[in-house]
C-alpha cells in the first residue's frame, strides 16, 4: 500500500524559484461545498477556478514547446506494439509523470481537494497532456476512450488564446447519458449532439465554458464535450485526468470500438490518500529527464 508523499503536497511553491507559477487566488478549499456537489451531480461540470499566474501560463507553454516532441503522439500509438516503445517515447498523456512543472500543476491542492470531494479520499492522476488546437480545428463531440472504460473526472486548464470561440464546449447533464457520442457516429454538429442528449436529458444545454488563461474547470469523465477553434489564433490547453486508484489504467491505441490496448503500463501519480488496490504503476515527482 502506497501513501501520498510530501512531494505531492508541495505543489504550491514557486516553480524551482524561477517563476511564480500559481496565482495567490488559487485557493485550496477543504473540498466542494454542498451546492457545488449538487451542481456537479446535476450538470456534470464545475468552475471556473483560478490557478496560474500570467507568468505561470507563459512558462507552462514554453515548457510544452521544449518537451512535447519527446512524447508519443496519438498517430504513432497505432503503430506501437512493444511495451518498451513507451519507455523510449512516453505516452502523450503521461506528461505529468516526466515534467516537474506539469506534475506540480496536476498535484495542486486547488484541484486535488475538489477531486477528493468527487472521487473520495484516494485519488490518482493518470493522464495529463497539453494540446494545441490550430485555427479551424474541430474536435468532434466525444467521451474520452479511457473514461468509457473506467470512471473518472477531468480538468480543462486554459493556457493560451482561450476565448469563447476556442474554449471547450460541454453539454450539461450529458454525463447521465447511457451511451457516448461515438455510439451515434461521428458528430461534429452542435445541434445534432444536443438533440441526441435532449432525447433523454431534456434540460441539457451546450455550454462554451468561459475559461480564461490560467483558469480551469472540472467535468465528469463521461460528459459529452468537443471544440471548434473558430478564433484567429491557435489554442493551447492542459487536460488532466483523475480516477480512484482501483481503476485499471491502460493506454488505448485507437479511438473507436473495438478499442486496442497498448501492452505498456502507464505511470500514474498518487495525489491524495493511499493506493489500496496496487493495480497501477505509481511514480514520484520527476527529478529530471523531460524537465523544465
Language-model regions: role of each:
Residues 2-25, 74-77, 216, 223-292:
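Non-heme Fe(II)/2-oxoglutarate
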Residues 19-20, 163-224:
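Double-stranded beta-helix
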Residues 143-144, 192-202, 253-259:
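Short, surface-exposed loop/helix-turn segments at secondary-structure junctions
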Residues 129-132, 143-145, 157-161, 170-172, ...:
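Short, structured patches in soluble enzyme cores that scaffold and shape functional sites
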Residues 148-164, 187, 210-211, 218, ...:
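Short, conserved beta-strand element in jelly-roll/cupin
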Residues 133-135, 173-178, 241-247:
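Short edge-strand/loop segments of extracellular domains
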Residues 137-143, 152, 166-171, 179-183, ...:
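A short secondary-structure junction signal
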Residues 2-43, 49-143, 148, 255, ...:
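Non-heme Fe(II)-dependent double-stranded beta-helix
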Amino acid at each position: 500500500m502506497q501513501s501520498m508523499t510530501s512531494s505531492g503536497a508541495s505543489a504550491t511553491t514557486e516553480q524551482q524559484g524561477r517563476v511564480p507559477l500559481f496565482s495567490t487566488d488559487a485557493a485550496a478549499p477543504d473540498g466542494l461545498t454542498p451546492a457545488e456537489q449538487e451542481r456537479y451531480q446535476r450538470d456534470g461540470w464545475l468552475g471556473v477556478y483560478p490557478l496560474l499566474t500570467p507568468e505561470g501560463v507563459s512558462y507552462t507553454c514554453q515548457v510544452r514547446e521544449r518537451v512535447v516532441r519527446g512524447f508519443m503522439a496519438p498517430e504513432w500509438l497505432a503503430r506501437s506494439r512493444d511495451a518498451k516503445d513507451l519507455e523510449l517515447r512516453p505516452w502523450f498523456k503521461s506528461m505529468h509523470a516526466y515534467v516537474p512543472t506539469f506534475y506540480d500543476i496536476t498535484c495542486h491542492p486547488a484541484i486535488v481537494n475538489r477531486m477528493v470531494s468527487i472521487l473520495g479520499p484516494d485519488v490518482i492522476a493518470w493522464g495529463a497532456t497539453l494540446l494545441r488546437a490550430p485555427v479551424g480545428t474541430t474536435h468532434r463531440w466525444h467521451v474520452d476512450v479511457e473514461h468509457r472504460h473506467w470512471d473518472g473526472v477531468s480538468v480543462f486548464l486554459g493556457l493560451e488564446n482561450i476565448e469563447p470561440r476556442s474554449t471547450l464546449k460541454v453539454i450539461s447533464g450529458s454525463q447521465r447519458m447511457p451511451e457516448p457520442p461515438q455510439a451515434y457516429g461521428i458528430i461534429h454538429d452542435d445541434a445534432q449532439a444536443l438533440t441526441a442528449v435532449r432525447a433523454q436529458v431534456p434540460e441539457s444545454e451546450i455550454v462554451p465554458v468561459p475559461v480564461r488563461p490560467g483558469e480551469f474547470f472540472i467535468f465528469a469523465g463521461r460528459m459529452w464535450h468537443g471544440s471548434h477553434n473558430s478564433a484567429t489564433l491557435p489554442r493551447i490547453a492542459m487536460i488532466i485526468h483523475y480516477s480512484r486508484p482501483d481503476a485499471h489504467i491502460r493506454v488505448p491505441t485507437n479511438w473507436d470500438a473495438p478499442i486496442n490496448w497498448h501492452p505498456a503500463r502507464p505511470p500514474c501519480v498518487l495525489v491524495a490518500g493511499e493506493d489500496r488496490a496496487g493495480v497501477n504503476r505509481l511514480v514520484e515527482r520527476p527529478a529530471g529527464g523531460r524537465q523544465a
